[in-house]
Amino acid sequence: MTVATYHHGNLANAVVEAGLRRVRQRGLDAISGRELAGSVGVTPAAIYRHFADKASLRAAISQAAREQLARAISLPRPRATNKQGAAERFRQIGLAYVEFALNEPLLYAAAFEICEPPRPDNPSAWEVLTEALDDLVRSGAMPASRRPGAEMVAWCAVHGVSNLITAPMAGVPVKQRAAVIQQVLDGVKRSLQITP
């Protein structure tokens, strides 16, 4: 039995949403155009009127996963203008990134599929991080001299610990895992000379 879950003109979005549901269950490698077509009530040929091939379909689903990551690290974290607020927002963004990886491991893995996205991410996790770093400098919580390249320092540290705790360290007790996450976040803070 198939059920149409899209409205005329919105098939591409319906397919990507169905793809995200499948990714959460089985991962990006389990994506099948035929299966997604059935889940939205169309033929496989209808899907490929919107996506050039399976690689394009996977790229769109990967991008949607990255955009979900961006939303997860954005909310509810309003931009801050004082040192303490900017530093706390930066820390919360790092924690939210790790929590996304822990809570949505297959979606997290799909987000970093090597592919050519159909358009720029919107929202973009990189832009969320960039804004947070700019706010740290504006508020005086981080020296301007530490700003160049700070995105890579922060991203690599948080992405690295996220990969470790979702794979090799998956069986580590929660308390020990939390301590490792905190050590990494503290290391980023020290490296970028963030105060307070």
Feature-to-residue mapping (PLM):
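Helix-turn-helix
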Residues: 14, 18, 22-56, 60
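Alpha-helical DNA-contacting segments of helix-turn-helix folds
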Residues: 23, 58-65, 111, 115, ...
